[in-house]
Amino acid sequence: MTLTDLETCAEEIATAARTLARDGHSGGYSAGLPDHLRPVQRTLIANASQVLALASQPADLVRQLALYNQLLACLRWLGEFQVLACIPLDESVPFEDVADIAGVPECRLRRLVRPLFTIGFLCEPSPGHVAHSVMSKQFVTQPALLDAILFMSETLAPSASAMGTQTRRFGASEQAEDSAWNMAVGSDSPFAECLQQRPKVKRQLGAYLSYVSSSIDAGVEDTLTRMNWQNLGMATVVHVGAQSPSLVVALAPQFPSLRFLVQTEAKAESGGHQPCLDNHGISALKLASIPLHLRARITWGTRLSTATQPVLDAAVYLISIPFPSPQSPAMEITMRVAQALKAHVEVLRNNSDARLILTLPMSSATRSMDAAARAAVSLSDLSLLQLTNGGSLNMGEIRDLLRSRSDGLVVMREVRSPTNAVIAFEIQYRVDNDDNRY
């Protein structure tokens, strides 16, 4: 990065900061951010990261790594003794009272929380008293945040530290039971087996993956907005295999003429054959996450992943493939792509105007990606390596799978933003495959 780049980043930071300031959140945004400001926040953070990289000296990097290493240890200690839950959400209390409730020495409590004050986590409003900050309060009301921290400190950090031992013993082995995690815990069983036996670790892994992949999710939204949605009119978009309504909630305000169906995956024993447009399987929590003014345009349904798509009149079938994880390795995800294509052949054949849009995370970081996207790709890849010796999606295999089909499905367009880590394939049914490939 040059000095000109530094000036450009500084200007973009100033512009983003002014936009956020105009929103009127004087207390900061730790408690949440309106959807329309999320791109502004990402721009601010991405440029700040670039400025930090340019301005830092090697000694600054050492100090930063030392600080975050200790902060992670402090957060783990708080989690182990459930200290955060011992502090009232809206008032300060003496350190002594918190220490008594948590059953920890007061002197240790004071020393371990004060480093966290430097990052806006907890605060000392008056001498000898501790209180929640806006940020730390979220770790009480949203337990998944603490689950992610505990997974990093208890499972991922020891695994990362064992990479040298793993390499000396197993080299470039791809066997799941030869991973750095196996070295760290002294187990001969693969990490996937641990997840089956320890629900707590499985829950923590899910929380960790949801937060580190958040920029991938933002990239899906960004990439999809580059597709040609305006000419669809009063059409229906089906989000196939959705884990949550977050993507359609993000898209709905941008395309007010569209209706959306959030189609979750049904269990074989839970009524998977019931009509897809019935609102069964919806939880109160998921419903509450949809803004009231959008609920009239968002409906719910379920479908077995192996079943043919029952919604016949949609204009777009949207399938978002996640990054590989210990629970869903790359080979399994490639099989899911093939399964999803097979499930939609009939509906696309009967409606040649309909499109299937398949989004996938990029398998490696590129120079054009912003800092958050590069970090998400690297974190996901390293986590997979350390825990299972697994690898990223092979985009060559995915492209071969899409190009070699003989059922009439053809990739009409490949779309991606240069700054994020998501690629989208627009697929339609064509009788003459050879003349319509991208």
From Swiss-Prot:
Q: Which domain of life is it from?
A: Eukaryota
Any idea which residues the entry calls the DNA-binding region? Answer: 95-114
Q: Which GO terms describe its cellular component?
A: nucleus
User: Known InterPro entries for this protein?
Assistant: SAM-dependent_MTases_sf (IPR029063), WH-like_DNA-bd_sf (IPR036388), WH_DNA-bd_sf (IPR036390)
What positions does the domain HTH iclR-type occupy? 65-134
Q: Where is this chain's protein located in or outside the cell?
A: Nucleus
Keyword vocabulary terms for this entry: DNA-binding, Nucleus, Transcription, Transcription regulation
Give the GO molecular function terms. DNA binding
Quaternary data: Interacts with aflR.
What role does it play? Transcription factor; part of the gene cluster that mediates the biosynthesis of aflatoxin, a polyketide-derived furanocoumarin which is part of the most toxic and carcinogenic compounds among the known mycotoxins. AflS exhibits no DNA-binding capability on its own, but forms a complex with the other aflatoxin cluster transcription factor aflR and acts as a modulator of aflR's DNA-binding by decreasing its DNA-binding affinity.
PANTHER family annotated for this entry? MONODICTYPHENONE CLUSTER TRANSCRIPTIONAL COACTIVATOR MDPA, PUTATIVE (AFU_ORTHOLOGUE AFUA_4G14580)-RELATED
Q: Mind telling me what this protein is named? A: Aflatoxin cluster transcriptional coactivator aflS
List the source organism.
Answer: Aspergillus flavus (strain ATCC 200026 / FGSC A1120 / IAM 13836 / NRRL 3357 / JCM 12722 / SRRC 167)
Supply the source organism's classification.
Eukaryota, Fungi, Dikarya, Ascomycota, Pezizomycotina
